[in-house]
Amino acid sequence: ILGLRDEKIICSSVPPYCIPLGNKVYEWLVNEFQNSDLHVIYAFSKDYYSSVASLNEMGATWALKHKWTGVLLPGFQFNQLDGCIDKTQIAIKLDDSDNRTLKYRLSEFKDELIKEFNLRPMSEATWERQRDDFLDRISTITEARARECKDTGEADQRHVPTIGQDDVGSIPVEPAFLL
């Protein structure tokens, strides 16, 4: 991701970013939270807020004052943010109706990560292609999930889960991951 080395990314249930074999999950996470300068990326959704593990990570991030960035998955609204996070902190909404704002926020985030982790910048053409491919994948997944909800008659069609452990593939996102 943007040239960040795999060993610098933790996504607890997604290989190769997962917790190393033989480790105790919570002991390992506590060690990472206490001994690393983390940047936590939240993928906010209804599913995120139903995950005890995700809420524990949110609390640890808040208590230890680690840097974080919020990403609202499609179908999740700003007024649904809850918990100990600062709800006034600007976040990225992946189904923002203002496409210019969405692209701008993603570019801001890319630039922030490049600066924070001293990564090699990429050309604008490469970035725009990767960003637009990412947004196209988000849109495709969202549309497929909306059709599934319609076909199955799922009651809450406003919440369309889009990305998570079941949809990792080339979009490495789970409820929260740490850099």
Regions found by a protein language model. Give the residues of each.
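Conserved BB-loop
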Residues: 2-31, 47-54, 114, 119
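Short, structured coil segments at secondary-structure junctions
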Residues: 5, 57, 64, 85-88
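A general structural motif
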Residues: 6, 36-37, 148-149
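Residues at the C-termini of beta-strands that transition into short coil/loop
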Residues: 13-15, 72, 95
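C-terminal interaction surface of TIR/SEFIR-family domains
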Residues: 75-179
